[in-house]
Structures are given as structure tokens and as C-alpha cells.
Amino acid sequence: MGDNKNNGDSGKLLYCSFCGKSQHEVRKLIAGPSVYVCDECVELCNDIIREEIKEISPKRDSDKLPTPHELRAHLDDYVIGQDRAKKVLSVAVYNHYKRLKNSSPKDGVELGKSNILLIGPTGSGKTLLAETLARSLNVPFTMADATTLTEAGYVGEDVENIIQKLLQKCDYDVEKAQRGIVYIDEIDKISRKSDNPSITRDVSGEGVQQALLKLIEGTVAAVPPQGGRKHPQQEFLQVDTSKILFICGGAFAGLEKVIEQRAHVGSGIGFGAQVKGEKDKATISETLSQVEPGDLVKYGLIPEFIGRLPVVATLTELDEEALVQILSQPKNALTKQYSALFEMEGVELEFREDALKAIAHKAMSRKTGARGLRSIVESILLDTMYDIPSVDGVVKAVVDESVVNGESAPILIYEHNETQAASGEQ
């Protein structure tokens, strides 16, 4: 077998036996016994084989579906607290993928789709729960911000772009994308201002809810393929969103007041009125756990949209003790992440217990939940991370409460100091 670019001994023009292109239209024409194949067809065959290999491997990985107990155990490794929300999510996600696995309906019973709504304050772990679930199931995951979405035809991001992002995460593999998870954050920000239908156009509120309806419930979305602008003649990819799990999350600030009005809690007047103090703050989480669809309608979500999110899980506000645990206990805890960074420089990093409590206290006062922990730790260690690569002999850095409060810098222990300290203890 050889490659032939000339007319050959016979002087005939040679053609690819597969696509019919002549030797002048291609870079290479490879000759076999009375057969010719061009370089373009060889490349296409390689692509087909690669796609088939890609399709086979995920099926092997996804044969065994983790049970709700296994999903919950995986969430426990990465997320502190939120026990009720973990249980609700584990069951809902398990049922969703069980439905996909057994797609042929038994006795004519077709299983409905159960998308999820997460309600909880900022930094309580909504995004982390969704991300961790996707990672444990080895499925594509993408996030979208509801505040950037607008109706089609207006300046902003179309809801169909969410599916485009999901496809990008799995190299435009439609089958893989249809098993993915989409998390839409700040869903409470697209609520309408009142529970009465508005006569004015609301392109980023109720309008977005209307646009999301079909996508969340299940439709066949037409998405341009990779490099769609370069190859406009290519057909659009058809993605069935009924197989995609949508998780929507939001803080829903003020929702507890709507629930209290419905339940007539604290609505007394004069001597009969309930006065809330500091100790009653924890009851906000308890109030949110009593949320009903009618409360969400009153808040500003349209009934049709709420109907597409039948599974509702509420998350509690994290207290100081939970924040201390978040700093040190999960597999990818912040203290472990920064310890790994320091280890790369050959330095051991130690956070004392009083330092962890001080960091948690600072995050509580900022009202940012777990989300604010990283910025606090980063600011504490900034100068040390700047200096250590240029300083020789440092073996350990210690962070205590005074460092967190800005009263001192982290304690640096040098190689010779460590030896002296050890001999002094004996």
C-alpha cells in the first residue's frame, strides 16, 4: 500500500473510493489493491471510532447507580450540616436517574420528572450540594445565574444558552449532556414584584420564568454545534431536556415573613404582639421549612414555574460551630487546601483552634456564611505566601487568634529554631 499523488503509469485521474474526490482535491490519496482512500476520509473514520469509544466508556461507568445512602455519605464528606436537605436531594436525584435507567414505562406508568428547588441563605451550601452530587454521579454539571437571563430577543443571555454551556462541558456529546445536572442560582431574583400579573413587559423577571418553563419541564432544544458560526451549514444539535435534572436555588430573603403572614405567627397587636429578639433568629430556618407553593406564588414566582419544581428542600443558616467544622473537616476543607499550598514550598501550615473560631466569628459578623471564609483566610495568609518562596529555612507557619484579629503576623518556625525547641523540651 502506498500514497499516490500522480496520475500513475496509466495517466488516469485517480479518485477516492469513499467520497469520490479526485487526487487534485485532496492532500493525500492512499492506494490499496484497486482501492483509493483520501486523507479526509481517513480523518473522518478516526473521528467515528473515537466517538464510539467515548460512548462505550460512560455506559460502563454509569451501570451502577449509587443508592440514596451512598449519595448522602458522599455529600457528608464535602458538606457540613444540612441533614434534611441532603436526604431530600439524595432521594430526588436517585429517583431521577432511576427513571432514566428504566425509560420504558412499566404497565403504561410513565414516571414524571422531579426538578428541585433549594431555599436557603447565602453561603449555606446550595451550590456545593449540587456540584458534589454531579461529581459523585460522574455526570456533566453547569451553573447559570438567573439574573443574567432575559427573554429571547432582548439584550442578555437566552435560556437556551444554559444547554449550550452544558454541551460545552461534555465536548458536545448530546447523550452525555442529557444525563447532566443544571444548577440555576439566584432564582428568587426573577420573581415579579407582586403576585398580580403585570401589564408591563418584564423581560428579566416573569418573562424569564415563562421562558424557563418548557426548558425545565422537558423540550427538544435546538443548539448550534461547536463552531456553529464557522460552519453555518451544519445542522443544529437536538437536546432532550426532559432527561436533564434542573436544580434551582435562591436565598428568598423575606420569604419567612410571607409564611408567617399565612400561618398568623407573630401577627398580634399591642400586648398580644410577639417581639422577636436575638434568640429568635434561628426560627427563620424553622419557618422556611414550612414553605408551601402558595407562599412562593405570593413571593413572586408564577404557579406554572413552581409546578415544574415539585421537590423543595430548605437549608438552615450556618452557625459559628458549623463554620469551624467547614474550615477543617470536609475532604476539601479550606485549611487542607492552604496546607497543600504551603507543602509545595516545603512548609507545614498549622491553624490553632482559637484561630478557626476567630475566622468563623468574623464570617458570621459579615453575614456571608461559608462563602466568606476563603477571603478571610486569603487575607490572613497573603503576606506569608508572598514572603515564604523567597525565605530559606522556614519549616512551619502557625496561625492563631491574634493573627486573625490583625494583631500579629503568622509565627514562622525555622529549621534551627525547631531543633532548639525540641532540645529545650527534653
Curated annotation (Swiss-Prot):
Residues that bind Zn(2+)? C16, C19, C38, C41
**Recorded coiled-coil stretches:** none
Where would I find the ClpX-type ZB domain in this sequence?
A: 4-57
Cellular component GO terms held in the UniProt record: HslUV protease complex
Describe, as the record does, how this protein assembles with itself and its partners. Component of the ClpX-ClpP complex. Forms a hexameric ring that, in the presence of ATP, binds to fourteen ClpP subunits assembled into a disk-like structure with a central cavity, resembling the structure of eukaryotic proteasomes.
Its function, per the record, reads:
ATP-dependent specificity component of the Clp protease. It directs the protease to specific substrates. Can perform chaperone functions in the absence of ClpP.
Report what the protein is called: ATP-dependent Clp protease ATP-binding subunit ClpX
Give the organism, scientific name: Shewanella sp. (strain W3-18-1)
Question: What's the gene?
Answer: clpX
